[in-house]
């Protein structure tokens, strides 16, 4: 929008300047033609009385009406001679007086000159002063000059447009749209989870059934539902089950007579939420697993059957807290 406004202002200014130049040129031509047209003829020499001095009057390129000098044929009359002398002073007009075309109409000084003293040959001298005044010929040389005036008007905006053309690529580069990060959706909190530990024999060996049974009973497990062992709230087997122990080999069940029984390991698991404090139950579960591993000569593994580490224990605790918060 601003570029279009500036372009319009430049075009209007160019038109105004060209109009002023054409008007000034036309006025100068008009004044110059009027000056050459009104240039008067050389004045005729007049001889005056023997007592007066002869003077040659000639306008130095004066522009104005031709003066008519009176020729006195009666030199004897001194009074008339003296009265006629001041008349040329009144008839004298400065050269710039004729610049105004209508001033020759006013001729009060000539009325003071008696008509009897004005010679007849002076009349044709006045005719060329009035003949070159028609205004129609002045318009003819001016009219063809006005016609080419619109041509520079059309050419003037061209440099202006060229001046604005390089301004287009100067536009500031738009910043690339920055993709807003998608809102991070909070993971739904777990409503329940299963914490799993394993007690396994060393590589290439198995756990003895009789030693395993004694260690399980010492840890407070009691054989029960689904043919697996459970750790209840009370050591005598009363109360809800806190966590359970199953065989690592499918189907995961046990035979109560475990004298001739061997296995590569057992799995201890706890469902969360559970009865009581889940974190306290988890500590009790970890202690039971360590006790059984010490008794049978095995190791405690995580749910991926890797060595249990402090980081994995903290991960189990975080899961328990998450479930507790989800069910709070």
UniProtKB/Swiss-Prot annotation:
Side Cytoplasmic, residues: 28-328
Pfam family, any one: ZipA_C
Main location: membrane
Gene Ontology BP term (one): division septum assembly
Domain of life: Bacteria
Membrane-spanning segments: 7-27
Region called Disordered, residue ranges: 42-186
Membrane topology recorded in Swiss-Prot or TrEMBL: Single-pass type I membrane protein
Compositionally biased region (Low complexity): 100-115, 123-171
UniProt KW keywords: Cell cycle, Cell division, Cell inner membrane, Cell membrane, Membrane, Transmembrane, Transmembrane helix
Composition bias, Acidic residues: 51-63
Membrane side Periplasmic: residue ranges: 1-6
Protein location: Cell inner membrane
GO CC terms: cell division site; plasma membrane
Keyword Cell cycle among UniProt keywords: yes
Database matches in SMART domains: ZipA_C (SM00771)
Keyword Hydrolase attributed: no
Family per similarity comment: Belongs to the ZipA family.
Subunit details: Interacts with FtsZ via their C-terminal domains.
Reported function: Essential cell division protein that stabilizes the FtsZ protofilaments by cross-linking them and that serves as a cytoplasmic membrane anchor for the Z ring. Also required for the recruitment to the septal ring of downstream cell division proteins.
Family annotation (NCBIfam families): septum_zipA
Protein name, UniProt field: Cell division protein ZipA
